[in-house]
Amino acid sequence: MGFIKIINILKYFIIFNISVITIYCISFSARAEIMERTLKNGLQVILKKDTRAPVVTSHIWYKIGSADEVSGKTGLSHALEHMMFKGTKKNPGGIFSQTISKLGGKENAFTSKDYTAYYQTLPSQYLEEALKFESDRMSNLVVKKEDFLKEIEVIKEERRLRTDDQSEGIAYEQLYANAYANSSYHDPIIGWMEDLDHMTEKDISDWYDNWYAPNNATAVIVGDIDFDKTIKLVEKYYGAKKPVKITERVKRNEPYQFGEKNVSIKIKGKPSYIIMGYKVPSLNNKNIESWECYALSVLSGILSSGQNSRLQKILVREKKIASYADSGYSMFSRNDPLFLIDVNPIIGKKISIIENELEKIITELKTKLVTRKELERIKAQVLASEVYQRDSIDYQARVLGMIKTSVGDTKIIDQYTANIAAVTAEQVREVAKKYLVSNLQTVVKVNEKIQ
């Protein structure tokens, strides 16, 4: 269980020596292998057949995440994720997990800004067991005060370990809090400690009652399945679930940013660190052409995909001023995300030196076209990564669930290969010039004065 740190989870760039031509001919998914249905109660169902092994993964995705929370009530989605493992009247705490384990399977859950998801991966003959348990807790969760009081302390400790005691965690949190003045992406997924201190079991119960329903969920099942038998099982266990009235989500638009935002943090005993984010569009942004999102993905690859990427080559290998340098971008988000760049300086190297080199790298991307060789190499790596990770049924389910929940149309997956392949050097330069600019930028530096 846990919340998702976007810059790590959304890094799909893995290097492979695969012919670009070969990769371009591979579609991420074939429509013949996918069935999509919507039950009468509003539950969306996606089935994907993969018979290479007698295994299945069953996911349920709820369109509810930290972006739906309000000031003073942050962390509810993540806290509810924890409480979902405490059991129902029919299946008290622990029975679900114990059963899945005995059947040779595994289970877990994750929360993001846009969604909360639960999954089980197990031998395909036991799919019905997973559906039986998962459907039960969609509407029958028991939230006990004693369970909540114990679990909220676990969550607070998780926050201390992952955020409050980590340079990167604090910087990442402050980046979003400062970059977004009004957007619902302002608050951390795990919640502010002040809000966790005041959270109650009633807050959890109300959140559950308001959002956990078939008409706010997508069931994704991938693996060694028969479509007809599987859809009947889904109907059997979810078909009788009653929909609820879902509160209309009001998009909170960002006001114009007049210049670069800079945040400097001092943390005693911690190493220096810098992270910057630029406000960029997602595929849900109707004010831009979709090619910009694919060009931004390629741009991220140019910066950090492999040992020959700009950040690795210049900061880590040539200048030897950083031990780690990365970038990240996801076009698959409900609201406009951040294009991220983060660097761990070598001990003794000033952050100002890192900033100067980053400025040179970004300026070059704005003023010069990337070479055809570099562009094709990056495209090959991005696409090869997608093809490689398609071997995992869990990865396939995650992509389907994420896109269905955040964007709405899974056909985007089929178009991904062609859209990445179509990106030009001119388009990469154009998005760099348009988005990697000061009035879209927020920079957070940890211990910048340390030498």
Give names to the regions the model predicted.
Residues 132-136, 233-237, 354-359:
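Short amphipathic alpha-helices in soluble, non-transmembrane regions
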Residues 1-10:
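N-terminal secretory signal peptides that target proteins for export/translocation
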Residues 25-66, 91-126, 162-216, 240-286, ...:
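Non-catalytic beta-strand/loop surface segments
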Residues 86-90, 138-146, 370-371:
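Short, polar/flexible loop-turn hinges at active-site or ligand-entry regions and domain interfaces
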Residues 74-88:
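Active-site SXXK
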Residues 12-25:
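Bacterial N-terminal signal peptides
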